[in-house]
């Protein structure tokens, strides 16, 4: 029999929140559904695994995620209400809005590739969230379908929310096209299937790396496949750096896509950042004719 989770049924922050159940878990921490009686609402609380509390690299990553997300106000970014350390045991936490629905990966796995007229409006909204983040000097660095959550809001059936800024890099200045955010040279962070060529090579990153990752997401959402055929994470990393993408219509010959959409994706997936759309707003504008 599994031991009971010590957080379930617990009141935290002076009784402000009552933790009801665990709704997700990952390498960094667990996410719980909790009630906030004073506000008459449900919230999601992400708590860093206690066993990781002594890992300075991971605690700093968790704090970085909280700081990055707390700066963002765009409706398509998950909203953070408060973050800090629990008084009782020092556990790091983030209190966020509670979302109902499924992530983009689950949607594609359940329903298959998403039609262009449905997929493009989703990605356009994500571009809006990224544009705000980039203007504040925040690069996500781990965009993937699992980090785009589809909820219902304001009568919109597919209302995406960008999640998990755990790998975000925050600078003190506003991001301009081509400006640099320093990472540890030679270190590779992110998810191999969705990382940009410069990220795969451990180079310095800016907003254009996120644009590449978002274009990979769009490609997979439309086709159910990635832009390259590969058998391992290392092979994906290599192909992002060296191999041209397979055009949409070649990847799924049974479906037809506008030639112009292939051209938009080819530009967004250029190996060289300077040849891509330079901002999320530019990518947004290029996608609009197809949505």
Tell me what each language-model feature is:
Residues 49-71:
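AlphaC helix of the eukaryotic protein kinase fold
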Residues 88-103, 107:
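Conserved short submotifs of the Hanks-type protein kinase catalytic core
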Residues 130-131, 191-291:
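C-terminal lobe helix-coil module of Hanks-type protein kinase domains
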Residues 122-123:
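Activation segment signature within eukaryotic-like protein kinase domains
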Residues 20-26, 31:
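Protein kinase glycine-rich loop
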Residues 82-85:
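A short, aromatic-enriched beta-strand patch in the conserved N-lobe beta-sheet
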Residues 127-138:
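Protein kinase catalytic-loop region centered on the HRD/HxD motif
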Residues 56, 151-197:
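Activation segment of protein kinases
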């Amino acid at each position: 029999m599994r031991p009971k989770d010590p957080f379930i049924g617990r009141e935290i922050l002076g009784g402000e929140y009552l933790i009801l159940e665990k709704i997700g878990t990952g390498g960094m921490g667990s996410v719980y559904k909790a009630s906030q009686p004073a506000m008459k609402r449900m919230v999601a609380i992400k708590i860093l695994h206690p066993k990781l509390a002594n890992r300075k690299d991971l605690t700093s990553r968790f704090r970085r995620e909280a700081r990055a997300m707390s700066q963002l106000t765009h409706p398509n970014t998950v909203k953070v209400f408060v973050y800090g350390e629990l008084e009782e045991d020092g556990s790091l936490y983030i209190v966020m809005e509670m979302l109902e629905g499924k992530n983009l990966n689950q949607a594609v796995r359940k329903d298959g590739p998403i039609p262009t007229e449905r997929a493009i409006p989703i990605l356009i909204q994500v571009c809006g969230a990224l544009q705000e983040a980039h203007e504040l000097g925040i690069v996500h660095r781990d965009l993937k379908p699992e980090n785009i959550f589809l909820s219902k809001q304001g009568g919109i059936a597919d209302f995406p929310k960008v999640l998990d800024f755990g790998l975000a890099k925050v600078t003190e200045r506003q991001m301009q096209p081509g400006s640099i955010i320093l990472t540890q040279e030679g270190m590779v962070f992110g998810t191999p299937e969705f990382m940009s060529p410069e990220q795969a090579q451990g180079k310095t990153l800016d907003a254009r790396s996120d644009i590449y990752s978002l274009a990979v997401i769009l490609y997979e959402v439309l086709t159910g496949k990635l832009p390259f055929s590969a058998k391992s994470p290392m092979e994906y990393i290599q192909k992002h750096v060296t191999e041209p993408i397979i055009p949409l219509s070649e990847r799924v010959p049974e479906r037809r896509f506008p030639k112009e959409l292939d051209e938009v994706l080819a530009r967004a997936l250029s190996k060289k950042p300077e040849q891509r759309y330079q901002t999320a707003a530019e990518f947004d504008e290029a996608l609009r004719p197809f949505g």
